[in-house]
């Protein structure tokens, strides 16, 4: 991938040396070296397919790749020949080796897998990651920026297994709602009786108007074109 870049660097060096030799009065300035950690010029991506596109988004770090791979495999095993599966993985440190392994294992004619580095968006943010969570839990919040050219997308946590065609979920009508999710009955039960600390967290930290409407964010249908107007104020 870098061969053309190496050639360009060396050819430019030769040409610049030639210019200096030919014109002793040439004005130029040499500055210190600069290294870029991320060279992604634009986080916006386009749909992988022109028709029957089913966009599915995951977020993961390199440590979670084995679990992520199981989730990806479950999506691919249950796919239909009638649709194209546009899988996007939001990440910041998955190794090239692991990316290659995943693509080699799962890429097919109607499955596209792409890795998008969104780490730079969160680099200067002092975000809280309690207990066993990592910063990747926030990555879903930039989907409306990364996927501006998508109407509707599915977000899935990496620690689940899909046992049916994910296209069925994508086709679920959600009316005028921006997000579709499932109510978290476990949290509702904890809030009501079993976990006083959960009740305090919901009331004092989250300040939820209706704690019993708390939902599980591990499976979401999101309308990206509309969410763009709401989410940026949360993280920027």
What are these regions (language model features)?
Residues 1-44:
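C-terminal catalytic/acceptor-binding lobe
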Residues 18-21, 38-236:
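Glycosyltransferase catalytic domains, chiefly GT-A lineage
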């Amino acid at each position: 991938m870098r061969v053309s870049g190496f050639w360009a660097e060396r050819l430019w060096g030769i040409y610049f040396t030639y210019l200096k030799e030919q014109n002793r009065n040439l004005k130029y300035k040499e500055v210190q070296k600069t290294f870029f950690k991320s060279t992604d010029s634009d986080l916006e991506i386009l749909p992988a397919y022109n028709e029957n596109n089913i966009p599915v988004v995951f977020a993961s770090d390199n440590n979670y790749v084995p679990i992520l791979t199981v989730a990806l495999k479950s999506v691919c095993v249950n796919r239909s020949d009638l649709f194209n599966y546009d899988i996007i993985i939001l990440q910041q440190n998955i190794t090239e080796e692991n990316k290659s392994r995943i693509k080699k294992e799962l890429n097919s004619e109607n499955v596209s897998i792409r890795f998008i580095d969104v780490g730079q968006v969160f680099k200067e943010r002092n975000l809280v990651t309690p207990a066993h969570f990592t910063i990747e839990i926030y990555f879903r919040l930039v989907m409306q920026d990364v996927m501006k050219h998508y109407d509707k997308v599915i977000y899935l946590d990496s620690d689940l297994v899909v046992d049916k065609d994910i296209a069925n979920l994508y086709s679920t009508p959600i009316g005028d709602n921006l997000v579709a999710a499932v109510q978290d009955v476990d949290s509702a039960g904890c809030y009501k009786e079993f976990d006083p600390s959960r009740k305090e967290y919901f009331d004092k930290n989250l300040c939820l108007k209706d704690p019993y409407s708390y939902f599980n964010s591990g499976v979401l249908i999101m309308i990206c074109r509309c969410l763009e107007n709401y989410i940026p104020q949360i993280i920027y």
